[in-house]
Every structure is written in C-alpha cells, then in structure tokens.
Amino acid sequence: MLSPDVLKKLEAIEQRFEELTQLLSDPAVAGNGDRFRKVAKERASIEQTVTALRAYRKLLDDVAGNEALLGDKDPELRELAKEELAQLRPQVEPAEEQLKLYLVPKDPNDEKDVIVEIRAGAGGDEAGLFAAEVMRMYVRYAERRGWRVELMDTSGGALGGVKEATLTVSGDAVYSSLKYESGVHRVQRVPATEAQGRIHTSTVTVAVMPEAEEIDVQVNPADVEMDVFRSTGSGGQSVNTTDSAVRLTHKPTGIVVKCQQEKSQLKNRTMAMKMLRAKLFEIEQERQRSARDATRKSQVGTGDRSEKIRTYNFPQDRLTDHRVNYTRHNLPAVMDGDVQDVIDACRTFYAAQALREASRGDAGAAERRA
C-alpha cells in the first residue's frame, strides 16, 4: 500500500490539476495567450500522474469489490471473483511503484533542446566509422520522435567516417531522453579493413548538453574572440569562396567552438554562440552539482563523458547498457534509431534511484523534526 505521505502528495497534485482545468475555461485566462499556454503546459505536465492515480483508485475498488464477493453464498459468483482477483492483485504493486516514480522531482532541464557532440575515440578509422553510425542512430531516433536535427559542425575521417560532429536536436522534452546518452560507447566487431577476421574494440564519446538560453547564461561580448575562415569539406578542401565559417574562443575558460554548416557568417555565428552558451551552462551545472554533493554518483544523463556506458557487440548481435544492466539484441534496428527501450530502462532505473534518495532525505528530515 502507498504510505499516507505519498497519497497526500498525489492528492495535492490531483487538486492542482483540477484547479488548472478550471483556469483553462476562465475567459480571462483564455484571452491571454501567454497565461493560457503556461497553464496548459503545467496541466499537461501532471496529467499523466493524475490519470495513473485515478486508475489506481479504480483498481483498488475492483479488488475490494471482488474480495467482498468471496463470502457470497453463490459458488459460481465466488469462483468468478477468484478469477478476477487473480488478474487484479498482481497489478497493484506495479501501479504503486509507477505512482511513486511520478513523484520524483523533475530535472529542470528536461524540457530543453540539446546539443550533441560525437567524437571518435580509440580505434583509429574504425572509431570514425562507428562515430558516423552513432550520429545516424541519433538522427533516425530523432526522426522517430518527430524532432528536428541540425548539423552544426563535422570533421570528416577516412573511409566515410567522422572524427567529430556536433548536432542540435529540438522538439518536445528532448533532453529528458537524450541525457542518458552521455558517456563512452564501445563497439566490438570485425572492421571492414580487417583481413584476418579479428574482432576489434573501438570507442566513441558522446556528450549531450541542454541548450542554454541567454537568460540562463550571460556571455560578455568582450570575453569572446571571433575568427572567420572558409568552410572546408570532409577532405579538408575549401567549399566556400567567402569567410563564412566562424570560430569563437571564450577567453576566461579557453572554450573554443566553431560552426561552418551555413553559407551565412551571421547564421554560423548565431549557432556557434548557441554552442558556447551550452558549454558554459554545462560547466555551471557541474559546479552546482559538485557543490551540492561531492560524493553523489548519479552522474548519468548529466554528462560524465569518461564513463563507459554501453557496448555494441556485433558478433553477438547484442547491446548492453552497463549502468542499468540492460541487454537487448537486434543491433541493426538499434543503429537505425530503435533505442527507446534502452532509454526507458535508463529513465526507470535512475528515477527509482532518485526516489530512494528523496525518501532517505524525507526520513532524515522527519527524524530531525522528532
């Protein structure tokens, strides 16, 4: 059974949902576009929780009703009640666990768009080839989700691979899903260039950063040095006759970003500034996390790039996410963007972890009050 504290929190959310529903029908709110969107967004953010709570109540009512029938004089009715209970009772605990997960505090960055950096690591040309495949995997996943992808910068490698690539992904709550991709992705397979048929291990590093708005990060123009140059193709040759590519250097931190995908220097500068703000935002987020808890290890999804998070074993047609001990097969589908189940496994695991931490915090607060 859910504890009284958990039920109280869920009922408060339901009450807020009802208040927001009434506000949406208020002419004063309906006539104010900004207010209406804000109210509608908040209501949508808790609607799933309320729906689950009401379904849970109905489930408990159904269980109680059938338990009452177990004492009925009619043996046929008692048998039907037993059959119903055999189906209903196993649903109670999973429903309760799901409701608890809805109470996990939301990451304030979850609704943000993201910047994804993909870099070939150890493994030479094979790492570059896999980096290109990982990039395509995210593009295909974004297409499945109805998100928009823009290539901001790329550095070509041999055999059609990439040394590094930077993408922006925009859409509905992009960071809430892609944040679990930060880290080292390891591939085990026989490279196309391997004549002896030996299995090689290569790595690709992925960094996912929430896109920062100007309100999130203030950048002093005097701290930014801008260089312009001609865009280059994958082989290094110039592909533009004007200096449209832009390189920005943030002098206080030494961060360097560049963008050369657009023909317009202004557009490249705008996109480069977007990348710079995201990197500075990430630094500030990391500083705050470290200040809150230097020993906390729930870094996944918030950017620990040195962590080996996943292995793609092609000879065994197997993907393993080492953080959550999740395994699945059919790598061709994975590389074509079919990764929602992996992301869901990560989300469930870390939400449960956050809930345990929050519960320990609540227990500690209760002890202090006592």
Curated annotation (Swiss-Prot):
Q: Which Gene3D superfamilies match?
A: 3.30.160.20, 3.30.70.1660, 6.10.140.1950
Is-annotated flag, keyword ATP-binding? no
Q: Which molecular function GO terms apply here?
A: translation release factor activity, codon specific
This chain belongs to the protein called Peptide chain release factor 1
What gene is this protein a product of? prfA
Any one Pfam family here would be RF-1
Q: Which UniProt keywords apply?
A: Cytoplasm, Methylation, Protein biosynthesis
Entry comment on modification after translation: Methylated by PrmC. Methylation increases the termination efficiency of RF1.
What's a GO cellular component annotated to this UniProt protein? cytoplasm
Function in brief: Peptide chain release factor 1 directs the termination of translation in response to the peptide chain termination codons UAG and UAA.
Indicate where the modification N5-methylglutamine is found in the sequence. Answer: Q237
Give the record's family classification.
Belongs to the prokaryotic/mitochondrial release factor family.
Q: Where in the cell is it found?
A: Cytoplasm
Give the superkingdom in one word: Bacteria
Q: Where is the composition biased (Basic and acidic residues)?
A: 286-296
Transcription listed as a keyword: no
Q: Where is this region: Disordered?
A: 286-310
